[in-house]
């Protein structure tokens, strides 16, 4: 039985995101984290993940920006996906100045590797042509 057909009279199953052809590192470790951002918090500095990351905003609004893509706002009830690897994640901060935002992220990484590494100022400068124009 597929997830699309798994609903019963007492429950409902709704697929929130589907990413075909996702590359998952061999023997991947999977971590699910809850991120809570106070109002106006800019989030984690530019970084990357060694494997894909799937996320769901459960409260508030998150500013989201990946290398090569324009920044966008993801609201409560919406999802995001990152391919991981060499792609820089520039922003994941709270879009609301006075209210808390929260999201859940599931991160995949090869065994023994951190799920997040920061990007140096030198690398950001060298790759600035890959960043989408900002509003």
Could you tell me what each predicted segment is?
Residues 1-31, 73, 81, 117-135:
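A short, N-terminal "cap"/entry segment at the start of jelly-roll beta-barrel domains
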Residues 17-19, 41-44, 88-93:
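A short, acidic/glycine-rich surface segment
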Residues 25-29, 37-38, 61, 67-86:
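Short acidic-glycine-tyrosine-enriched beta hairpin
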Residues 27-28, 40-54:
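A short beta-loop-beta micro-motif enriched in histidine and acidic residues
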Residues 32-34, 54, 79-81, 105:
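Conserved hydrophobic/aromatic beta-strand scaffold that supports enzyme active sites
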Residues 36-37, 49-64, 103:
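Short, conserved beta-strand element in jelly-roll/cupin
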Residues 44-48, 66, 73, 92-95:
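Short histidine-centered beta-strand/loop micro-motifs
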Residues 70-71, 84-114:
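Ligand-binding loop in jelly-roll beta-barrel domains
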């Amino acid at each position: 039985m597929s997830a699309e057909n798994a609903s019963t009279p007492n429950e409902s199953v709704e697929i929130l995101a589907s990413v075909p052809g996702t590359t998952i590192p061999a023997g991947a470790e999977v971590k699910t984290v809850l991120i809570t951002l106070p109002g106006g918090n800019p989030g984690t500095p530019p970084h990357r993940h060694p494997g894909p990351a799937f996320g769901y905003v459960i409260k508030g609004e998150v500013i989201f920006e990946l290398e090569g893509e324009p920044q966008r706002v993801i609201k409560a009830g919406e999802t995001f996906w990152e391919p991981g690897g060499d792609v820089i994640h520039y922003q994941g901060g709270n879009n609301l100045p006075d209210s808390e935002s929260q999201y859940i992220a599931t991160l995949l990484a090869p065994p023994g590797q951190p799920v997040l590494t920061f990007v140096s100022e030198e690398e950001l400068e060298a790759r600035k042509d890959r960043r989408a124009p900002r509003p």
